[in-house]
Curated annotation (Swiss-Prot):
Subcellular location, principal: membrane
Subunit-structure text: F-type ATPases have 2 components, CF(1) - the catalytic core - and CF(0) - the membrane proton channel. CF(1) has five subunits: alpha(3), beta(3), gamma(1), delta(1), epsilon(1). CF(0) has three main subunits: a, b and c.
Pfam families: ATP-synt
Protein's GO biological process: proton motive force-driven plasma membrane ATP synthesis
Name used for this protein in its record: ATP synthase gamma chain
PROSITE patterns associated with the record: ATPASE_GAMMA
Keywords, sorted A to Z: ATP synthesis, Cell inner membrane, Cell membrane, CF(1), Hydrogen ion transport, Ion transport, Membrane, Transport
Keyword check for Transport: yes
Function description: Produces ATP from ADP in the presence of a proton gradient across the membrane. The gamma chain is believed to be important in regulating ATPase activity and the flow of protons through the CF(0) complex.
GO molecular function: ATP binding; proton-transporting ATP synthase activity, rotational mechanism
Family to which this protein belongs: Belongs to the ATPase gamma chain family.
Cellular-component GO terms for this entry: plasma membrane; proton-transporting ATP synthase complex
Compartments where located: Cell inner membrane
Length: 286
């Protein structure tokens, strides 16, 4: 019965792991719902501020904010939003693949790259992969604040204003739904003012103190809000990916337990049959 004992011990070990993955799945579900609420709360602001910038740009067409001026691209910056923890499937791996692909295109064109990394997994990746990381922040927690991001974002904005980078993009996972998280590379600046549907009505607005000053203030807020929205959405995507990963692990553990239980039953049956055969053989000899 030595084999049966080993199998029984393995079954007990897998059941213990299954309890852990099941608990982690339930925790991820709870955290995902909270993250979805934060994402839904911040999304209207992030979307609306871009519309307001479009209005302001059209209100003062002769003024072009530095963040709206296209120039020759010699160096680009990326704000890379990753997770602090693992056990979330291929979430970070898929994000890094999309980023590396975009970086390769820039490098083929002779464009240099600077990186601002959010999350421990991103920092660990670039320590191995290599890259010019000029700013990094991690351990934002389950409820990130925009104030925690301002310092790192300012490093990239100052680099753009001083001409050290010519384009800034944010790289993060978009939360499509519970089953789908999509890695995206989205250009932040220079921002191209897109005509808004409301502008077709030629409505007039009064701006105090004036459109130029408002635009100067809003452009920085716009970039900060977009990075914050990326962090919040990435958090929701992380929890969804972790929930799915832990559910798959729990289900796989159940399948493995069933297979081992069958093997255990066969081993036990074989041992009992062997014992009966030995008893019958001994009785016949007597």
């Amino acid at each position: 019965m030595a084999g049966a004992k080993e199998i029984r011990s393995k079954i007990a070990s897998i059941k213990s792991t299954q309890k852990i993955t099941s608990a982690m799945e339930k925790v991820a579900v709870s955290k995902m719902r909270k993250a979805q609420m934060r994402m839904a709360a911040s999304r209207p602001y992030a979307e609306r501020i871009r519309q307001v910038i479009g209005h302001l740009a059209n209100a003062n067409p002769e003024y072009r904010h530095p963040f709206m001026i296209e120039r020759a691209v010699k160096r680009v910056g990326y704000v890379v939003v990753s997770s602090d923890r693992g056990l979330c499937g291929g979430l970070n791996t898929n994000l890094f693949k999309a980023l590396v692909k975009d970086m390769a295109v820039n490098r083929e064109n002779g464009v240099e790259i600077d990186l601002c990394v959010v999350g421990s997994k991103g920092a660990a990746f670039f320590r191995n992969f290599g890259g010019n990381v000029v700013a990094a922040i991690s351990h934002l927690g389950e409820e990130p604040s925009i104030n925690d991001l301002i310092g790192s974002v300012k490093v990239m904005l100052d680099a753009y204003l001083e001409g050290r980078i010519d384009r800034l993009s944010v790289v993060s996972n978009k939360f499509i739904n519970t089953m789908t998280q999509q890695p995206t590379v989205e250009q932040l600046i220079p921002l191209v003012a897109t005509p808004d549907q409301e502008l077709k009505h030629h409505w007039d607005y009064l701006y105090e103190p004036d459109a130029k000053e408002l635009l100067d203030g809003l452009m920085v807020r716009y970039v900060e809000s977009q990075v914050y929205q990326a962090v919040v959405e990435n958090n929701a995507a992380e929890q969804a990916a972790r929930m799915i990963a832990m559910k798959n692990a729990t289900d796989n553990a159940g399948d493995l337990i069933s297979d081992l239980q069958l093997i255990y039953n066969k081993a036990r049956q074989a041992a009992i049959t062997q014992e009966i055969s030995e008893i019958v053989g001994g009785a016949a000899a007597v």
